[in-house]
Amino acid sequence: MASSSFLLLATLLAMASWQGMASDPSPLQDFCVADMHSPVLVNGFACLNPKDVNADHFFKAAMLDTPRKTNKVGSNVTLINVMQIPGLNTLGISIARIDYAPLGQNPPHTHPRATEILTVLEGTLYVGFVTSNPDNKFFSKVLNKGDVFVFPVGLIHFQFNPNPYKPAVAIAALSSQNPGAITIANAVFGSKPPISDDVLAKAFQVEKGTIDWLQAQFWENNHY
């Protein structure tokens, strides 16, 4: 009986520990500004000497000024993470501005390390995400100025501007100093080196010629 109780306790502690490690680690001091030049390799960045820290380590100028030029898929992502603001190190948050051309989109992608909460600043967006296997349930919504939508961590999601005449702008907050992004089309058809067309033809149940054509396209590196 004692052995069973000990095993149960150990299991619960292990689960609690795993949950604690499932997000960015909590800071153990007021701040830990990332030392981008440190040779020390850690999960994140080593701390800059607090005596060398100044206000600019917590600052980034002009995120909401002029509209950004959009790319081939009709969007432009301006990411502010620990690489742009070293003071974000250990704080578990980052932010992005997304500009959408008329009929532009931020294509299906995932953030492996972060939940995202999106707020529409201008225009209208059609957004959605898909749950994991086996259900693959699709949740979608049309958002207008001021509306907010959440994309759970790790799930495939997208945003699309359905207006053929007007652009749209949104701000996204993400629950990691470095959320990462995997744009699905880029990863599958634009990997370097390419995934075997035998593998992809079987996976998508199409001819290898179709896969070869897809892999030959220019895949836009548009993600955050």
UniProtKB/Swiss-Prot annotation:
The keyword Cytoplasm does not apply. CDD domains: cupin_OxOx (cd02241). The keyword DNA damage does not apply. One of its GO terms (cellular component) is apoplast. Disulfide bonds join C32-C47. Mn(2+) binds at H109, H111, E116, H157. It is found in: Secreted, Extracellular space, Apoplast. Coiled coil: none annotated. SUPFAM superfamilies: RmlC-like cupins. Pfam families: Cupin_1 (PF00190). Glycans are attached at N76. Keywords: Apoplast, Disulfide bond, Glycoprotein, Manganese, Metal-binding, Secreted, Signal. Residues 1-22 form the signal peptide. InterPro entries: Cupin_1 (IPR006045), Germin (IPR001929), Germin_Mn-BS (IPR019780), RmlC-like_jellyroll (IPR014710), RmlC_Cupin_sf (IPR011051). GO terms for molecular function: manganese ion binding. Member of the 12 germin-like protein gene cluster located on chromosome 8 in the major-effect quantitative trait loci (QTL) for fungal blast resistance. Partial suppression of the 12 germin-like protein genes increases susceptibility to the fungal pathogens causing rice blast and sheath blight diseases. Plays a role in broad-spectrum disease resistance. Probably has no oxalate oxidase activity even if the active site is conserved. Oligomer (believed to be a pentamer but probably hexamer). Belongs to the germin family. This is Germin-like protein 8-11. The lineage of its organism: Eukaryota, Viridiplantae, Streptophyta, Embryophyta, Tracheophyta.
